[in-house]
Amino acid sequence: MYHPKALIIALLFTLSLILAAKSAEQLQIGVKYVPEECPVKSRKGDRLSMHYTGTLAKDGSKFDSSLDRNRPFEFTLGAGQVIKGWDQGLLDMCISEKRKLTIPSHLAYGERGHPPVIPPQSTLVFEVELLGIKNRHVDEL
């Protein structure tokens, strides 16, 4: 004989597993700091200057950091110059804003990884700070 409470508990447990799996597949954007004034936000086509530190989600080991080189990283947002998780996760950022991006493997380096530093199927975590937007005219900033 089935007990309604046991059935409900089993359904809730199954639902929680499904939701946990879904969240692991999606880009997670955590806003760590936003300046009080934000006259301009990043958009596709912008040339961004960033500081970042990248770690593996599974063990927290650092694989890269612009801070270690004391040299910001520059790229064009939305141009495919970086992993998809960055192109998506850095949209609508303010200058000086800091974010934590948790990027599932399919939006990072996928099944191949980036040997020898990033294993296949790795979820990546990036602490990022937008230092500047290089290509905007003064009146747009």
From Swiss-Prot:
Residues 1-23 form the signal peptide. It catalyses: [protein]-peptidylproline (omega=180) = [protein]-peptidylproline (omega=0). Residues 45-134 form the PPIase FKBP-type domain. Inhibited by both FK506 and rapamycin. The keyword Signal applies. InterPro entries: FKBP2/11, PPIase_dom_sf, PPIase_FKBP_dom. Belongs to the FKBP-type PPIase family. FKBP2 subfamily. This is FK506-binding protein 2. The gene is FPR2.
